[in-house]
């Protein structure tokens, strides 16, 4: 938050005659003890976020769906001292997520459980903690559940932040502020604030009463005040309203009068302006509680005529769909890991993310707000009747209202969120489609849709659909191609019809259901840009490539540890195909890129879709085939390929692709030139003699014990050119207040672990991930490899 904003908020709080102490929020991420075997052994000290499953060895027998990692459970333990400053406030332990299931004890008493690791919870421990000055012990048991509780790698443990929070007995509830902007134009915008309050039932000692002519009247008045601050910190609007006293309800819900903001600065993908609202509860001139949050003023619209509009302008979603691991750190939700991923996607032209298939961490949505990314926010994968693909100890169908309440109330103030997705690929089996009503999820969807709109009436809902026809007719069924092609039953009742794959069938679907709003919620990476160019982008919402980044789990064979038909490796190194996608998503930037075929790759049918990926490189070194196929990716209409200055011909591009088959290998320089002035070359290098270190986010490294620093390392020859065929062992040593969190090389097939200080480079590449300590200062990193000169980087944490 800016200094200007802090000053203005303090001024706002001081507007009234008095105020109570502010809410307290204590970071509870450090000082944990960890033991995978209970407390009989010697526990290990660590800080969270932490993914204990990523530290377990790869095991073939563990199965590919969870990334060949064994299932397991572990214990965490920490302590805190009851602070006298908390006074009479209620005290909560706030867990943003325990993967996959977990239980919580405080001072030896079990106080909470969670059945869905992708959503958080809080537990009121006010009556469980010791008096001021006393030490309280918190213990957490976390389990991955059994192997088939999930289809992908989930990780395990305290993988998201934990906090201690306090708030007054009479207060704004958890996620109790809801800000919406029902009317938005360039001239003015309506801002609506709805509140949920706790503790405002009748209490004579609080409200007071007077008797007059046999009537009882309250002598105290409680006001709710909402103050809106602009992106620059200026106070731009305010509204007040009386808090109603509810005789019997634990929670009070009401809306304040609408505010009007003149000439609003809108949140947009190209200019993500964020406002702030502060809500104060004021009793007789004294602020008794306050809370604040960021929001965006923006208008979203969906229609079969134009797909999606943001602030009145057509926007086509250029999206990725991925599970929420971050490579070598597993599912541990470090802000920096999330940010580097989103920034990388943004730089390659993506403007949206479909969360798959679960809510992401709170930091993800905050960063998406800041970076101007659109989000399709997804609730769960399936709606199962039993425990298959559900890790919870309680049935999903008994829990979804509670879980949906937490999910939507948590995320509804983020302007990045434009659509609620309630599930994914339910028509694979009726046991995944919710209640046993025989309609492939239609009844269950309608129930969930009503419930979702009770919590947030401003957004539409959808479900990602498996590529079957109505009646769950699969690809192998002879009726699959029989006309008319009828979409799955759910597609005809949803607000937005989200289809995974099969974009070529959309015209047939529209012929029978012309009012459907279409979104290609998953597209095959093996088809490259075809799903993007072949769609009617003027009338559809967007396209989202499945598995744009490598992820752990959903592997079809050992020793491949996960999905790898991707544009980016799990270390976020872009493959040549990534530049192809960029050339399409950012046509205003002339781009040409070479991809040399190393292997045609495997081909398989996955989810009734033909999948696979060429193994491409940017290497022109000896050791490969004597005749090599070469792709040229370009947003030029025509490209020319040259070898050592001699033209190999010109070709027109189709979907930004041209291909030369059987190019004879001759050492030297292979160059591609586009008719739009763009060019790219690869060339034969010398032997590796040095190491190039590329620091990501230079100058940005907080000494808070949680921030990460990424160093990309490349083997180079005497001319400084990167050498792609190097596999020397790289060794890392660190001096200063930091430690090696992980050492990666981008190899999705290796059995090596990440929590090491030495590892073989893979194709001349390695990635060093450092975790900051708590002391600011210089950190010296020394990298060495046999036969290669060492390299040193001096970094500074602040």
Predicted feature residues:
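Substrate-binding clefts and catalytic carboxylate motifs of secreted carbohydrate-active enzymes
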Residues: 24-42, 71, 98, 147-148, ...
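Accessory beta-strand-rich segments of carbohydrate-active enzymes
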Residues: 26-28, 35-37, 66, 71-174, ...
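An acidic-aromatic loop/edge-strand motif
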Residues: 28, 49, 57, 64-65, ...
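Active-site-adjacent substrate/metal-binding segments within catalytic domains
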Residues: 54-82, 86-95, 99-107, 112-115, ...
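Aromatic sugar-binding surface patches on proteins
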Residues: 119-122, 248-261, 654-659, 750-767
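Extended acidic/polar, glycine-enriched regions
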Residues: 130-133, 194-303, 660, 666-667, ...
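Beta-strand-rich structural segments
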Residues: 193-197, 278-280, 610-616, 630-633, ...
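Short flexible loop/turn segments that cap and initiate beta-strands
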Residues: 206-210, 214-225, 270-275, 627-629, ...
């Amino acid at each position: 938050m800016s200094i200007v904003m802090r000053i203005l908020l303090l001024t706002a709080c001081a507007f009234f005659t008095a105020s109570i102490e502010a809410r307290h929020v204590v970071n509870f991420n450090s000082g944990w003890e960890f033991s995978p075997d209970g407390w009989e052994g010697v526990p290990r000290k660590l800080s969270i976020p932490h993914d204990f499953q990523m530290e377990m060895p790869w095991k073939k027998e563990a199965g590919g769906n969870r990334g060949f990692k064994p299932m397991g459970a572990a214990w965490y333990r920490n302590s805190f001292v009851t602070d006298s400053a908390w006074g009479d406030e209620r005290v909560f332990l706030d867990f943003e997520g325990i993967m996959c299931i977990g239980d919580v004890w405080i001072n030896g008493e079990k106080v909470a459980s969670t059945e869905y690791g992708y959503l958080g919870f809080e537990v009121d421990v006010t009556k469980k903690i010791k008096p001021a000055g006393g030490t309280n012990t918190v213990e957490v048991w976390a389990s991955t559940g059994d192997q088939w509780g999930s289809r992908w790698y989930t990780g395990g443990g305290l993988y998201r932040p934990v906090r201690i929070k306090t708030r007054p007995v009479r207060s704004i509830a958890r996620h109790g502020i809801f800000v919406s902007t029902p009317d938005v134009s360039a001239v003015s915008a309506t801002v609506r604030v709805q509140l949920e309050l706790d503790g405002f039932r009748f209490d004579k000692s609080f409200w007071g009463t007077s008797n007059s002519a046999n009537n009882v009247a309250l002598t105290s008045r409680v006001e709710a005040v909402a103050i809106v601050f602009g992106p620059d910190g200026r106070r731009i609007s305010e509204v007040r309203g009386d808090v109603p006293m509810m005789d019997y309800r634990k929670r009070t819900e009401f809306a304040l009068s609408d505010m009007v903001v003149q000439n609003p600065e809108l949140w947009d993908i190209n200019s993500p302006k964020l406002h702030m609202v502060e809500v104060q509860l004021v009793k007789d001139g004294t602020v008794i509680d306050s809370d604040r949050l960021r929001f965006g003023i923006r208008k979203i619209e969906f229609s079969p005529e134009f797909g999606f509009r943001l602030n009145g302008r057509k926007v086509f979603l250029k999206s990725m769909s991925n599970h929420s691991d971050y490579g070598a750190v597993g599912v541990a939700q470090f802000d920096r890991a999330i940010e580097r991923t989103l920034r990388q996607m943004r730089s390659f032209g993506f403007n949206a993310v479909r969360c798959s298939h679960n809510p992401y961490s709170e930091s993800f949505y905050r960063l998406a707000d800041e970076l101007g990314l659109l989000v399709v926010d997804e609730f769960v994968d399936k709606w199962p009747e039993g425990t298959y693909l559900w890790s919870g100890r309680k049935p999903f169908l008994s829990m979804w209202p509670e879980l949906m309440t937490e999910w939507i109330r948590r995320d509804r103030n983020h302007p990045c969120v434009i659509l609620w997705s309630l599930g994914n690929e339910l028509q694979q089996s009726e046991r995944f489609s919710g209640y046993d009503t025989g309609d492939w999820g239609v009844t269950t969807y309608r129930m969930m849709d009503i419930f979702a709109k009770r919590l947030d009436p401003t957004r539409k809902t959808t479900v990602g659909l498996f590529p079957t026809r109505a009646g769950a007719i699969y690809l192998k069924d002879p009726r699959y191609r029989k006309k008319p092609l009828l979409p799955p039953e759910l597609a005809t009742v949803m607000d937005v019809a989200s289809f995974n794959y099969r974009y070529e069938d959309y015209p047939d679907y529209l012929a029978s259901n012309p009012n459907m709003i279409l979104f290609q919620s998953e597209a095959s990476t093996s088809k490259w840009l075809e799903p993007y160019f072949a769609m009617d982008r003027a009338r559809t919402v967007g396209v989202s490539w499945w598995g744009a980044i490598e992820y752990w789990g959903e592997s079809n064979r050992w020793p491949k540890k996960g999905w790898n038909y991707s544009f980016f490796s799990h270390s976020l190194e872009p493959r040549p195909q990534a530049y192809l996608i960029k050339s399409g998503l950012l046509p205003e930037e002339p781009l040409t890129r070479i991809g040399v075929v190393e292997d045609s790759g495997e081909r398989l049918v996955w989810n009734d879709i033909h999948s696979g990926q060429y193994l491409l490189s940017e290497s022109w070194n000896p050791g490969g085939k004597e005749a090599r196929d070469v792709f040229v990716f370009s947003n030029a209409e025509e490209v020319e390929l040259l070898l050592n200055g001699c033209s190999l011909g010109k070709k027109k591009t189709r979907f930004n692709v041209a291909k030369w088959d059987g190019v004879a290998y001759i050492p030297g320089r292979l160059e591609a030139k586009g008719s739009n002035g763009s060019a790219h070359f690869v060339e034969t290098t010398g032997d590796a003699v040095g190491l190039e270190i590329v620091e990501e986010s230079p100058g940005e490294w907080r000494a808070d014990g949680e921030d990460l620093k990424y160093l990309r390392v490349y083997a180079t020859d005497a001319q400084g050119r990167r050498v792609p065929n190097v596999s020397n062992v790289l060794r890392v040593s660190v001096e200063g207040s930091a430690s090696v969190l992980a050492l990666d090389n981008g190899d999705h097939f290796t059995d090596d672990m990440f929590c090491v200080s030495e590892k073989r480079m893979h194709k001349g590449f390695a990635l060093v991930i450092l975790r900051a300590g708590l002391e600011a200062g210089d950190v010296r990193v020394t990298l060495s490899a046999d036969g290669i000169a060492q390299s040193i980087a001096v970094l500074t944490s602040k």
